[in-house]
Amino acid sequence: MMIRYDELKVNDVVMFHGANVRIIKVTETPAPASEYYPNEKTIAFDIEPADEEAEKILGKFYSHDSYAGVGCLELELVKRDSQ
């Protein structure tokens, strides 16, 4: 199921680097000024691993426990698991 990035909410589960991750914070910020998209917004996500396998996968990319400010283009939408 395709979900628009601006529809993602806290507790949604999506894929990041092949790992299921849960969104824990959504931040909308103005994008850098652009003559083509002057009013464009950027959405950033703070995420956490959704399971043990995700922790192992993310450990290959990050040497810390904070996954803050992930860009929406890096997320692959796989499922919505709001609880």
Please provide the spans of the model-predicted regions:
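Mixed-charge, Lys/Arg-rich low-complexity intrinsically disordered regions
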Residues: 1-10
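Compositionally biased, low-complexity intrinsically disordered regions
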Residues: 19-21, 42, 73
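Short beta-strand-centered aromatic/proline hotspots
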Residues: 20-31
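Short, solvent-exposed secondary-structure boundary/capping segments
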Residues: 30-44
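Intrinsically disordered, low-complexity, charged/polar segments
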Residues: 48-83
